[in-house]
Amino acid sequence: MTISRDKMIELEKRTIEEFKIDYLILMENAGMGIFHEINQYDSFTIICGKGNNGGDGLVIARHLILSGKIVEVFVVGDKESEEFSKNLEIIKKLTDVKYIEDDNFDELIESIEVNEITVDAIFGTGLNRKLNKFYRSLIDAINIHGNYIIAVDIPSGMDADTGEEYGNCVACNVTYAISDIKKGELLNSNVGELKKIYIGIVRYKDE
């Protein structure tokens, strides 16, 4: 079973507004679920956008750090979501956070090459625009230098409904689809292996 972007938004909204399950709880469930899938590895580069996909990435980073793993956190983007900001304040108490603010990716590339796993938590299913040169170059750097790449929910740069690439997208070994596999993920091989992560979205029996 797959789901559209709009249906996923509808289910999330219902879970939060009708059933009063805070988005931070869903984010925690997503991050914890992916943590349990990858905690057999020892070293990680986690690249987070400033939206809720990046918030999921910060939750993953926190649990990896608390379990004794080597974790380097990079943040990219402009406007922060409320949930991202809350998780950023937590992670700053546990480790140094590095910011990618121009097209000099040397520090990021060094981290990616040294660490076993690269976690793509830049863009989620809400992306619906062409990527600018900066983000295309960032994704190229990840694809070229990553040893083993996983995506949080969807590879950054991919349309959730069509699988279209908005210039390019992260080429993943594994994509951990949060709650449901998105329609577009079956239409683009850059997702790699697809696995679903249960987070407690409320749905009715006929959905």
Protein language model regions, located:
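Catalytic cores of large soluble enzymes that bind and process phosphate-bearing ligands
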Residues: 3, 19, 26, 30, ...
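Generic secondary-structure signature for well-ordered alpha-helical cores
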Residues: 13-17, 32, 39-40, 96, ...
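Nucleotide and nucleotide-moiety/phosphate-recognizing core
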Residues: 35-122, 130-152
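Positively charged, low-complexity intrinsically disordered leader regions
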Residues: 1-41, 203-207
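YjeF_N-associated NAD(P)HX repair module
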Residues: 2-4, 115-207
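S-adenosylmethionine-dependent methyltransferases
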Residues: 28-33, 47, 71-74, 195-201
